[in-house]
Amino acid sequence: MNEAGTPINPIAFQLGPLSVHWYGIIIGAGALLGLWMAMRESEKRGLKKDIFIDLVLFAIPIAIICARAYYVLFEWSYYSEHPGEIIKIWKGGIAIHGGLIGAIATGIVFSKVRGISFWKLADIAAPSILLGQAIGRWGNFINQEAHGEAVSRSFLESLHLPDFIINQMYIDGQYYHPTFLYESLWSFAGVVILLLLRRVNLRRGNLFLTYVIWYSIGRYFIEGMRTDSLMLTSQLRIAQVISIVLIVLAIILMIFRRMKGYADKRYADTD
């Protein structure tokens, strides 16, 4: 058993001088599982399954760059003094909202170039994106980041958590709220909901917008528990502001697209 105070080594293994970090392995695993899910669904919706391979070849590196840039921007007071740390993403410090912005922008351009509906691609990808986020939070677990306020061990035990989670939440002599776990479970629940909503045959675009709303609601409340949030002011957490904006924007888009006739097609339509 991993003893309290002895965290899991963030380095999974060495390849000569190269250190392979669990963080990268977990993020990569989430991306691959999400890609597999999207490829399976794309064939059912009249698209070639390799369309998502082409998309992720652009979307993943751009999303990672945007996620890191977003984080660095709001922590510039530190990175301006330590510029060599900017590229060290294996230590953590990538923001999901930044990655989402990069992925959406890439998807819009990609869909225009390929002559495919962006909303069709986004609907198919929505459960995959959320699955990747759910898995990716375990990279934060290994790095002992994205945690909440200090708590007692007895509190963590009252949640019936396995010992390996409780022990990994022991950081510098104190136990912490496993907020990474709360967000991961919220995201896994969202994947199930989105997969069920596929059967309802929603209007095109609404599945993706439902993902945005679901994720943002969970992120808003869980972010309030974290101690390492990016801050806009001393009292205002950036992720909470962005979450509110995304919820409002998604609802407006649902209504606007319906009123203007832009959402007449359904999820299951193959054209």
From Swiss-Prot:
It is an enzyme of class 2 (transferase). It comes from the Bacteria. It is found in: Cell membrane. Pathway: Protein modification; lipoprotein biosynthesis (diacylglyceryl transfer). It holds the Pfam family LGT. It is a multi-pass membrane protein. GO terms for cellular component: plasma membrane. The chain crosses the membrane at residues 18-38, 51-71, 89-109, 115-135, 177-197, 205-225, 236-256. A 1,2-diacyl-sn-glycero-3-phospho-(1'-sn-glycerol) binds at R137. Keywords: Cell membrane, Membrane, Transferase, Transmembrane, Transmembrane helix. One of its GO terms (biological process) is lipoprotein biosynthetic process. GO terms for molecular function: phosphatidylglycerol-prolipoprotein diacylglyceryl transferase activity. InterPro entries: Lgt. The keyword S-adenosyl-L-methionine does not apply. Catalyzes the transfer of the diacylglyceryl group from phosphatidylglycerol to the sulfhydryl group of the N-terminal cysteine of a prolipoprotein, the first step in the formation of mature lipoproteins. Belongs to the Lgt family. This is Phosphatidylglycerol--prolipoprotein diacylglyceryl transferase. It comes from Bacillus velezensis (strain DSM 23117 / BGSC 10A6 / LMG 26770 / FZB42) (Bacillus amyloliquefaciens subsp. plantarum). The lineage of its organism: Bacteria, Bacillati, Bacillota, Bacilli, Bacillales. The gene is lgt.
